[in-house]
Each structure stands twice: as structure tokens, then as C-alpha cells.
Amino acid sequence: MISRLTGKLVEKNPPQIVIDVNGVGYEADVSMQTFYNLPPVGESVQLFTQLIIREDAHLLFGFATAEERKTFRQLIKVGGIGAKTALGILSAMTADELARAVAEEDVKRLSSAPGIGKKTAERMVLELRGKLVAHTVTDGLFAAAPAADETEDIVSTLLALGYSEREAKAAVKGVPEGTDVGEGVRLALKNLLK
């Protein structure tokens, strides 16, 4: 498995790039988000990668961050979404934007990505709910990835009780870090009832 490449960027032709690693040129497809963040040709670059092996080809996909690669891996697990479609989605929106769209069940936003219709967008919401986490705080609803397993367990419990992911994450913000799951759920429910 090729997990990461560090070398000199020798070619940039969207969506493909070539990185020279000790005399071996690795061709990788990258999202446009990654492509626009690449340095000029001739400079050093590091890419996180995902190798997809099919009967007829070995395909290497590159990502600027490990988080983008993780999101790609989640996307290709969704029925009806292949590697090229997943790359198209990550070209249309950042990993954080995708996580927010899934959490908010924004089917319209998801179906605006190339190759994604309404049914596939609905399937994405269903299959990715709770698996993607936004890592930037923009509207006060999303914080960094949960700091402890307890936080994830509290959110999961609230989801099982029928609350939306958005409500659950907002409620958990008022729970002190390190609180055990039982007490955390109680405090989160109290926050929801305010």
C-alpha cells in the first residue's frame, strides 16, 4: 500500500500530477481542492495517498491532508460512489463542507456535486451520518473532532434517542470534557430542553 509520497512535483495537469520520489515518477489523481494548494512545479511536495487496485488498473489518488483522504475513504464505501465520483465530490466541496452538508442533511448541496443525484445524495446522508466530522468552527455548531470517546458515545446515544446530529453536537458542547457517558447524556438532554 502506498500511503504517502514526498518528493518533487514534476507535472501538474488537472486532475493529474506526477511526483518524483527518488527517481520514480508517481502519477496521482487529485481533487481540485488539493490541486489548487500545490506548490509550483519543481518544488517539494507531500501527498497522502490511496491506492485503488482494479482488474484493469492500479489507480493512485492524492490528498493534501490526511483528513481529506479519510473522507475519500468514507465516500467510496457509499453504494453508487466510485473513486472518480468521490474525487469529484471533494473537488466541489471541502471535507468540512461535506461533513456539514451530511450533518445538516442538505441533500440539495450534496446533489450539486458532479455525478450526484438526489437519490445518491440521500444515500450519502444515510450512510455517512455520524462518520464525518467538521474540523473548523464556523457557525458555532461544529467543533474539532471529539476529544474523548465519551463525547462520541454521548452523541451516539442522543442520535439513538431520535435527535438530529446537529442537535446532538450542539447539546454536547455544554457538557464538560471528561464527564462519564451517563452523566454526559443527562446534561446534554438538559441542554436540549432549555
From Swiss-Prot:
Residues 1-64 are annotated as: Domain I. Pfam families: HHH_5, RuvA_C, RuvA_N. Coiled coil: none annotated. GO terms for cellular component: cytoplasm; Holliday junction helicase complex; Holliday junction resolvase complex. Residues 144-147 are annotated as: Flexible linker. GO terms for biological process: DNA recombination; DNA repair; SOS response. It is found in: Cytoplasm. InterPro entries: DNA_helicase_Holl-junc_RuvA_I (IPR013849), Hlx-hairpin-Hlx_DNA-bd_motif (IPR003583), NA-bd_OB-fold (IPR012340), RuvA (IPR000085), RuvA_2-like (IPR010994), RuvA_C (IPR011114), RuvA_C_sf (IPR036267). GO terms for molecular function: ATP binding; four-way junction DNA binding; four-way junction helicase activity. Keywords: Cytoplasm, DNA damage, DNA recombination, DNA repair, DNA-binding. Residues 147-194 are annotated as: Domain III. The keyword Oxidoreductase does not apply. SUPFAM superfamilies: DNA helicase RuvA subunit, C-terminal domain (SSF46929), Nucleic acid-binding proteins (SSF50249), RuvA domain 2-like (SSF47781). The keyword Metal-binding does not apply. Residues 65-143 are annotated as: Domain II. Homotetramer. Forms an RuvA(8)-RuvB(12)-Holliday junction (HJ) complex. HJ DNA is sandwiched between 2 RuvA tetramers; dsDNA enters through RuvA and exits via RuvB. An RuvB hexamer assembles on each DNA strand where it exits the tetramer. Each RuvB hexamer is contacted by two RuvA subunits (via domain III) on 2 adjacent RuvB subunits; this complex drives branch migration. In the full resolvosome a probable DNA-RuvA(4)-RuvB(12)-RuvC(2) complex forms which resolves the HJ. The RuvA-RuvB-RuvC complex processes Holliday junction (HJ) DNA during genetic recombination and DNA repair, while the RuvA-RuvB complex plays an important role in the rescue of blocked DNA replication forks via replication fork reversal (RFR). RuvA specifically binds to HJ cruciform DNA, conferring on it an open structure. The RuvB hexamer acts as an ATP-dependent pump, pulling dsDNA into and through the RuvAB complex. HJ branch migration allows RuvC to scan DNA until it finds its consensus sequence, where it cleaves and resolves the cruciform DNA. Belongs to the RuvA family. Has three domains with a flexible linker between the domains II and III and assumes an 'L' shape. Domain III is highly mobile and contacts RuvB. HAMAP family: DNA_HJ_migration_RuvA (MF_00031). This is Holliday junction branch migration complex subunit RuvA. The gene is ruvA.
